[in-house]
């Protein structure tokens, strides 16, 4: 498989890691979905795959929340990260604001640049990370799932807890150790290990400090400017996508991507589509994730929730952003994240299979959609 990676556009062979069975060089076959239209996929999704998910998404009110996984940096000047971007650039997330479109294109094209080398069986050495115990509102207000009813921002905590509980279990089952990442919630601007950033960039993952960053106002922007349906599960998809980048960083997949290469089959697009698939894999297992004491974090996920997440993927495809947000003609040569159809395909591949080995976007002959 490394040879196939080397031959694919925008790739070079990753360093041999030998730690996780689902790393890029060990991926097997890819799952495919009907390709006739987005509407067709939605019908298949609604009618056959998730009929057992009937009630709306429901966070367990009695679940104790681990706020150490979320750092509320609002009003604190941001996380004390590094200065310049250096060789480790932020990996782009789900989408961007209109104001940040140019920044988005620049950062996205650089996605997956120089990353830390090596990931031994014990996991990569942890950099200095922030903590949710910094006195922010989230740490003060969010103790149980029921607290979401009085402070909507608490929602980010069980989502992050659930995502990391799944990946910790998945890594352990494959004989390795998952290194948790802190989600930094900021307002307008922040400092990171990848350099300073503003809300215009959208949610992103910084490989230099192995953390996720998000201004929660992005969720509202998804609805008002991008036209997404929104909702808890759509918001969860955004964060799960960023944690997909964290997984790629930990297992070495990101090192196979050459910086600055764009296009419909480029390394950047393949990386983003795989992160979408990983987000879907988590979503498939969301109702099985638990707190440290074994209580479920998410009790119910509905068909409407799944449809809202898929709708969000549609709204942040490169073709949608270029034509609907940027008012330009679609130019596939500038794709960095994949088309709406591609993003939907890989998100639903993860949702349907629940298997990270099915998230093969790197093989030479894989059908990206």
Language model regions located:
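Short pre-active-site segment immediately N-terminal to the catalytic Zn-binding motif
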Residues: 220-237, 263-269
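Pan-zinc metallopeptidase signature
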Residues: 59, 317-369
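Active-site recognition of the HExxH zinc-binding catalytic motif
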Residues: 167, 214, 237-250, 276, ...
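Catalytic zinc-binding patch centered on the HExxH motif and its immediate surroundings
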Residues: 189-215
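Catalytic Zn2+-binding segment of zinc metalloproteases
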Residues: 243-259, 281-282, 286-288
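Short helix/loop segments within enzyme catalytic domains
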Residues: 154, 158-160, 164-166, 170-171, ...
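Long amphipathic alpha-helical segments used for membrane anchoring, targeting, substrate engagement
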Residues: 49-141
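Post-HExxH zinc-binding segment in Zn-dependent metallohydrolases
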Residues: 52-54, 58-78, 263-294, 309
């Amino acid at each position: 498989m490394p040879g196939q990676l080397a031959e694919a556009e925008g790739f070079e062979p990753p360093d041999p890691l030998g730690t996780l069975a689902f790393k890029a060089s060990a991926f097997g076959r890819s799952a495919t979905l009907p390709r006739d239209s987005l509407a067709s996929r939605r019908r298949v999704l609604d009618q056959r795959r998730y009929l057992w998910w009937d009630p709306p998404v429901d966070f367990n009110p009695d679940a104790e929340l681990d706020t150490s996984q979320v750092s509320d940096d609002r009003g604190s000047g941001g996380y004390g990260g590094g200065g310049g971007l250096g060789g480790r650039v932020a990996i782009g997330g789900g989408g961007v604001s209109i104001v940040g479109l140019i920044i988005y294109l620049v950062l996205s094209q650089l996605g997956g640049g120089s990353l830390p080398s090596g990931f031994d069986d014990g996991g990569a050495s942890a950099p200095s990370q922030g903590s949710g115990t910094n006195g922010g509102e989230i740490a003060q207000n969010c103790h149980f799932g029921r607290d979401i009813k009085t402070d909507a921002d608490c929602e980010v905590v069980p989502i992050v807890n659930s995502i990391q509980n799944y990946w910790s279990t998945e890594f352990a089952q494959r004989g390795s150790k998952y290194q948790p990442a802190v989600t930094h919630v900021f307002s307008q601007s922040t400092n990171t290990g990848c350099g300073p950033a503003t809300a215009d960039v959208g949610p992103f993952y910084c490989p230099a400090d192995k953390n996720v960053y998000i201004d929660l106002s992005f969720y509202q922007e998804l609805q008002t400017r991008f036209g997404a349906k929104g909702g808890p599960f759509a918001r969860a998809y955004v964060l799960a996508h960023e944690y997909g980048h964290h997984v790629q960083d930990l297992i070495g997949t990101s090192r196979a991507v050459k910086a600055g290469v764009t296009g419909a089959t480029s390394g950047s697009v393949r990386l983003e589509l795989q992160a979408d698939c990983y987000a879907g894999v988590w979503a498939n297992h969301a109702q099985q994730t638990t707190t440290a004491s074994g209580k479920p974090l998410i009790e119910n996920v509905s068909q409407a929730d799944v449809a809202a997440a898929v709708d969000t993927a549609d709204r942040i495809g490169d073709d949608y952003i270029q034509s609907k947000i940027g008012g330009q003609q679609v130019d596939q040569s500038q794709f960095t994240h994949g088309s709406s159809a591609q993003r939907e395909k890989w998100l639903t591949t993860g949702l349907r299979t629940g298997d990270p080995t099915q998230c093969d976007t790197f093989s030479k002959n894989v059908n990206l959609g």
